[in-house]
């Protein structure tokens, strides 16, 4: 079980044949800001089966208030507009979902104490 129960599950749909360009822009311009303001991510993924050209990232938060506080830090960071401008033409759609962890007794023994993955 994750120690931060609120997860930002974000999905970007990227223009056809532009994923590599998007990943470069994201890594160079967004990641420094995100690491500084949001902290360590849970992971990054691209779609393999199902809808294509999608980039997914997951960030964990203590609460909705923690999500809102760190999101404000990101949105007001002086370097963040450069990423927004550089990526605007690459993104077709964005979905942002806040999902909550479910604590199931039947699988508690599968998770490490620090909460990030199976033993």
Give a label for each model feature.
Residues 2, 24-42, 62-99:
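An amphipathic, aromatic/His-enriched active-site/gating alpha helix that lines ligand/cofactor pockets
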Residues 6-13, 45-75, 95-97, 110-116:
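Short, well-ordered beta-strand segments in beta-rich or mixed alpha/beta enzyme
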Residues 1-25, 32-33, 40-41, 103-106, ...:
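Surface-exposed interaction/gating patches
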């Amino acid at each position: 079980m994750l120690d931060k129960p609120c997860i930002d599950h974000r999905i970007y749909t990227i223009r056809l044949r532009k994923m590599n360009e998007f990943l470069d822009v994201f890594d160079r311009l967004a990641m420094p800001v995100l690491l500084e303001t949001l902290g360590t991510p849970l992971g990054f993924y691209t779609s393999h089966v199902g809808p294509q050209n999608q980039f997914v990232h997951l960030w964990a938060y203590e609460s909705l208030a923690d999500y809102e506080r760190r999101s404000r830090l990101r949105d007001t960071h002086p370097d963040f507009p450069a990423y927004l401008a550089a990526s605007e033409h690459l993104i077709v759609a964005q979905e942002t979902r806040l999902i909550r962890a479910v604590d199931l007794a039947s699988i508690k023994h599968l998770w490490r104490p620090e909460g990030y993955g199976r033993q």
